[in-house]
UniProtKB/Swiss-Prot annotation:
Possible transcriptional regulator. Involved in promoting segregation of chromosomes during meiosis, perhaps acting downstream of the let-60 RAS / mpk-1 MAPK signaling pathway. GO terms for molecular function: DNA-binding transcription factor activity, RNA polymerase II-specific; sequence-specific DNA binding; zinc ion binding. The keyword Cell division does not apply. This is Paired zinc finger protein 1. Residues 115-136, 154-173 are annotated as: Disordered. Residues 159-172 have a biased composition (Polar residues). It comes from Caenorhabditis elegans. One of its GO terms (cellular component) is nucleus. It comes from the Eukaryota. Expressed in proximal gonad.
Length: 504
């Protein structure tokens, strides 16, 4: 097969249009621009349109991501070794050899395509040759021997024609085993191509089996589990891309894959957290209790999701009771409840900020054991002593308690004879009766607290007590008792003039 015919004047002739050229570069550029615009795919025997490139066709139709094209004849091959073997055959014999390309130009003569499936030594009308010169076989090529590529022996045409399917052949008459994709059914000739196809087309999205929601492509499974279900660590199977809660379930899943060839799942045992979006629950799940009749995917999914635990506050699903209790403790039970005003403080607001802003208490003391908050250090020490001796600390009234135990503790504090704060609401009572003292506005409480604080400052600021006396507990008991008297007098008659002669 001669692509270039030389005349007597040493000019290069184009075998398609008959034009003459002076050098090889001009002829190659002419063939690329004029005669190499369309190709014929030899895998599907279809003409590739001009608006679609050869690489796009191989990538979309046959999942072949890389091509090796001969610069001289514009034939396309799947590997670099076959391209070098083709070029070696062209240099030595002027013929392309026995390597069948993936695609060839549409302008190539019909005898070129027929010569690929015809034994050149048997003689042919389309391919004239004077002497039966041996065509170099693939196994005898020095390039392939150097690359240590194992080639299968050439089989006869009868065996290849007797097969029911028409697999792709790299050498004439040699079938290549196809590897089907388990998701879409496409066939591939290399495991690398199948792995790349699964990663690009079938592993882009996941379905969360906890909330039955589609995880978008811009969000990973780890981010979804961490933000929606409070699961900080997950384990992925590299084979099928399933996601599990712990490593024990992942190892059991891999063992099941090796033994049965398919992933198995039973409610409460080896259940994944998320599966690829294209995976069907009916197809991949082997439930412990099989359905009696032919149920659809929704029946299997309802049986699978029935074992999930849901949060009663927000409705989120969780894999285990431990995850549910942790979510309930961190999300719905975080923060404190103020005992003074019965206000629930959110997680972002600390007890110190609330007491300083609402009740003008600038310093609080927290118990490290139960996280209760007290107004004085003395109350905190009494609380700790009660914890050590009796194991119950409800005889000292706190100013704030954790939200998770607020209901039971507040009820017991109301019923018990605990240490009471000064009844600031009694000063603001009216003639409406004792029922009006149960609910005091917050502004009156803040006003009364400020009056009491001013009374203490008046007593301490008058210089009646020395530093040694202020260091004693009995002195402060006397100060608070006198401040209580001043508090009632200031509420009744306004701010009085305090004399230095206070009964000690």
């Amino acid at each position: 097969m001669d692509y270039v015919n030389r005349n007597l004047d040493d000019k290069l002739l184009c075998g398609i249009c008959g034009k003459y050229f002076s050098d090889d570069e001009s002829l190659r550029e002419h063939r690329r621009q004029r005669h190499m615009t369309c190709h014929m795919c030899l895998l599907c025997n279809r003409r590739i349109p001009e608006n679609e490139t050869l690489r796009e066709h191989m990538k979309n139709k046959h999942n072949i991501w890389k091509l090796f094209i001969c610069v001289c004849c514009n034939w396309s091959f799947g590997t670099e070794i076959y391209l070098k073997c083709h070029e070696e055959c062209m240099k030595s014999t002027g013929r392309p050899g026995l390597l069948k390309p993936l695609a060839m130009p549409m302008t190539a003569p019909a005898r070129e395509a027929s010569a690929l499936n015809t034994d050149p030594q048997n003689g042919s009308d389309d391919v004239p040759h004077s002497s039966p010169s041996p065509v170099p076989m693939i196994a005898e090529n020095s390039i392939i021997q150097a690359s240590s590529l194992k080639m299968e022996p050439i089989e006869s045409a009868d065996r290849s024609s007797a097969s029911t399917s028409t697999p792709r052949t790299l050498v004439s008459g040699t079938p290549r085993e196809k590897i089907p994709c388990g998701f879409c059914g496409k066939d591939f000739f290399h495991e690398g191509s199948l792995r790349e196809h699964r990663r690009r087309f079938h592993m882009t999205g996941h379905t969360c089996l906890l909330c039955n929601r589609q995880i978008p492509e811009n969000e990973t499974v780890r981010d979804h589990m961490k933000s929606q279900h409070n699961i900080k660590k997950v384990y992925n199977c590299l084979c099928c891309n399933w996601t599990f809660l712990n490593q024990v379930h992942l190892i059991s899943h891999k063992t099941c894959l090796k033994q049965t060839g398919k992933p198995c799942c039973r409610p409460g045992h080896m259940e994944p957290l998320a599966i690829p979006r294209t995976a069907s629950i009916r197809q991949f799940f082997t439930l412990k209790t099989e359905t009696q009749s032919g149920d659809d995917d929704s029946a299997a999914g309802s049986q699978l999701f029935s074992a999930r635990l849901s949060c009663k506050s927000c409705g989120k699903f969780f894999y285990s009771e431990r995850s549910l209790s942790k979510h309930h403790r961190q999300i719905h039970m975080s923060g404190h409840v103020c005992v003074l005003c019965n206000h629930q403080m959110p997680k972002t607001v600390t007890v110190q900020e609330h007491m300083e802003k609402e009740h003008n208490i600038r310093l609080v003391f927290n118990c490290r054991c139960c996280n209760w908050s007290f107004a004085t250090r003395r109350c905190l020490m009494s609380h700790v002593e009660c914890l050590k001796k009796a194991g119950d600390a409800r005889n000292v009234k706190p100013v704030a308690i954790p939200r998770m135990a607020a209901d039971s503790i507040l009820q017991s504090l109301k019923e018990s004879e605990a240490q009471e704060y000064p009844d600031f609401s009694a000063a603001s009572t009216t003639s409406s009766g004792p029922a009006s003292t149960l609910k005091t506005p917050r502004m009156d409480f803040k006003k009364n607290l400020k009056i009491c604080t001013d009374a203490v400052q008046i007593l301490v600021g008058n210089g009646l007590f020395s530093n040694e006396q202020l260091a004693q507990t009995e002195t402060w008991v006397m100060i608070f008792s006198n401040a209580n008297k001043l508090f009632h007098s200031m509420n009744s008659f306004g701010e009085p003039s305090v004399s230095r002669d206070i009964p000690m």
